[in-house]
């Protein structure tokens, strides 16, 4: 079964973007490259079990096993030594990427309290969009009763767009609810 967002991209979004930005070739149209989910677990320094819980939650949210990130440098103020595990991240590509974006836009973001749309100022100048989520509970896979601690995560949507304008238009066409 083909993904709904991928089919929409090929049938509707590509022609719309070609018209809007006057591309000479369909290959110039920006597309999603990957979505990176990152969960920093600073309290893993004192209790390694917290990292295991974060890895488990990220696995449920993304559908694939996360990579444990480690400290590059030692920082005495944080009681951190080089090489200590301090977070987890997942790179989503292909079908899983479209599945996750679909779920994010249509299920998870509407579950955020006092949600008025995502910020339009989170583009990085190279066509990538970063979104911070304050609590992992907005995802339907996370069972509220099994959560010991509310954790946030960063979601980076990497596109092949050259400018923020093109990237924003691409995400708007996908249905990303930007704040007015």
From Swiss-Prot:
GO terms for biological process: translation. InterPro entries: Ribosomal_uL5, Ribosomal_uL5_bac-type, Ribosomal_uL5_C, Ribosomal_uL5_CS, Ribosomal_uL5_dom_sf, Ribosomal_uL5_N. One of its GO terms (cellular component) is ribonucleoprotein complex. GO terms for molecular function: rRNA binding; structural constituent of ribosome; tRNA binding. Keywords: Ribonucleoprotein, Ribosomal protein, RNA-binding, rRNA-binding, tRNA-binding. SUPFAM superfamilies: RL5-like. Transmembrane segments: none annotated. PROSITE patterns: RIBOSOMAL_L5 (PS00358). The keyword Zinc-finger does not apply. Coiled coil: none annotated. Belongs to the universal ribosomal protein uL5 family. PANTHER family: 60S RIBOSOMAL PROTEIN L11-RELATED. This is one of the proteins that bind and probably mediate the attachment of the 5S RNA into the large ribosomal subunit, where it forms part of the central protuberance. In the 70S ribosome it contacts protein S13 of the 30S subunit (bridge B1b), connecting the 2 subunits; this bridge is implicated in subunit movement. Contacts the P site tRNA; the 5S rRNA and some of its associated proteins might help stabilize positioning of ribosome-bound tRNAs. Part of the 50S ribosomal subunit; part of the 5S rRNA/L5/L18/L25 subcomplex. Contacts the 5S rRNA and the P site tRNA. Forms a bridge to the 30S subunit in the 70S ribosome. This is Large ribosomal subunit protein uL5. The gene is rplE.
